[in-house]
């Protein structure tokens, strides 16, 4: 189990060419450019599926470490996860997580992990997505 504000698991290095900083804890999708990522958002298929989480802020034009699978403990970002509850890609804010599945027509539901404690999660992105009609 990781200490507070820590990520443990399998990592990959990817580039940020979004024009802004990808912040620690944001989930990302792979863009159409090799090795580049951007914050995922469940309201459009073009910004999904999420496959990794930033383990630190990654400035525009920089390459950073992204968690592909593992455990995250962050008492400032995760304050109300439900033990055993599913965690989803947000449909309202790019890169964010949500404890509630997207429900509006045209949005995509992707389970990204499971709450292990109020401020800990198992990050385990599931790649099948369901489109809400």
Per-segment meaning from a language model:
Residues 1-133:
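Glycine-anchored, exposed beta-strand/edge motif detector
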């Amino acid at each position: 189990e990781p200490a507070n504000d820590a990520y443990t698991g399998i990592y990959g290095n990817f580039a940020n060419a979004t024009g802004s900083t990808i912040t620690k804890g944001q989930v990302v999708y792979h863009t159409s450019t090799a090795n580049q990522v951007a914050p995922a958002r469940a309201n459009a298929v073009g910004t999904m599926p999420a496959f990794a989480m930033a383990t630190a802020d990654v400035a525009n034009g920089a390459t950073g470490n992204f968690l592909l699978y593992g455990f995250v403990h962050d008492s400032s970002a995760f304050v109300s996860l439900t033990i055993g509850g599913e965690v989803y890609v947000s449909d309202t804010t790019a890169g964010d997580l949500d404890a509630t599945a997207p429900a509006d027509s045209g949005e995509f539901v992707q389970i990204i992990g499971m709450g292990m404690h109020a401020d800990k999660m198992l990050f385990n992105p599931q790649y099948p997505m369901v489109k809400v009609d």
